[in-house]
């Protein structure tokens, strides 16, 4: 599972670099990401078709978010498993403490009861 996590992380880094490069090579005529907030004459749902660079950038942004969710899911599962394993280990070590103590005290109680019955 660690190998899969490593490859997903490498692909995540490559996708991040591609997003940076694609945003840098886009022209500043309102077609890019900055054009959404101050695009001037272009509209969000305009009839003008978006360029290939904008479509590719959108695709890589979608991949970026998919890999973010995958990595967070994989890392969360790993942290939960290791935490639960630590708790199980602690419980195994501590279970003998009260078992031994109770068995000795039970034997002592039985001896006391037998002695009391003999005295009566």
Curated annotation (Swiss-Prot):
It is a multi-pass membrane protein. Its main location: membrane. The keyword Nucleus does not apply. GO terms for cellular component: plasma membrane. InterPro entries: SecG (IPR004692). GO terms for molecular function: protein-transporting ATPase activity. The keyword Protein transport applies. It is found in: Cell membrane. Keywords: Cell membrane, Membrane, Protein transport, Translocation, Transmembrane, Transmembrane helix, Transport. One of its GO terms (biological process) is protein secretion. The chain crosses the membrane at residues 6-26, 54-74. Pfam families: SecG. Involved in protein export. Participates in an early event of protein translocation. Belongs to the SecG family. This is Probable protein-export membrane protein SecG.
């Amino acid at each position: 599972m660690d190998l899969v996590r490593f490859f997903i992380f490498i692909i995540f880094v490559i996708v991040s670099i591609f997003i940076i490069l694609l945003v840098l090579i886009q022209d500043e005529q309102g077609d890019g990401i900055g054009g959404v907030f101050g695009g001037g004459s272009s509209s969000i749902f305009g009839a003008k078709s978006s360029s290939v660079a904008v479509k590719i950038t959108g695709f890589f942004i979608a991949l970026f978010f998919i890999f973010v969710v995958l990595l967070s899911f994989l890392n969360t599962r790993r942290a939960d498993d290791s935490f639960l394993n630590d708790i199980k280990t602690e419980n195994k070590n501590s279970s003998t403490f009260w078992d031994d103590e109770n068995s000795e005290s039970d034997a002592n109680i039985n001896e006391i009861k037998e002695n009391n019955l003999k005295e009566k």
